Amino acid sequence: MALIKKFRIKSFKVDETIVELKNISFFYNKRQILNNLNLKIKKQEILGMLGPNGVGKSTIFNLITGLKDPNYGEIIINGINCTNLPINERFTKFKLGLVPQYGGLIHDLTLLDNLKLVSEIHIKEREL
């Protein structure tokens, strides 16, 4: 079982839910990874998940971003059910981002600088 820990970035309370997983179940090769998971992520929260391999940590992120689809349940982002939205719509419509566990980062830059670099490249492409 994964341990899910939430932190708030600021000290004041914000109740606006931006991501909600409702009754999510997910199977991988007939093995149930998630069973009726319910999770709310509110604005200005940082979510950390700890646990051994195979308990669903990466699967949760893959479900939120649309890299995987749940077998059962709903994924709500900013109040919109996006369970069946294609991945490209989910990333562009909701401005989702994902930092890979391995690779994909320039090691000499901080995480913030890596994110800034990607956003600058994306903005420049749109301006062309």
Where are these regions (language model features)?
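Conserved Walker
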Residues: 58-59
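ABC ATPase NBD coupling module
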Residues: 81-97, 102, 121
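The feature captures the beta-strand-to-loop junction immediately N-terminal to the Walker
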Residues: 50-52
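Helix-to-loop junction immediately C-terminal to a conserved catalytic motif
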Residues: 65
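Conserved ABC transporter NBD signature motif
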Residues: 73-82, 91-93, 127-128
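Conserved structural motif at the start of ABC-family nucleotide-binding domains
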Residues: 19-21, 34
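Q-loop/switch helix immediately C-terminal to the Walker
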Residues: 102, 108-121
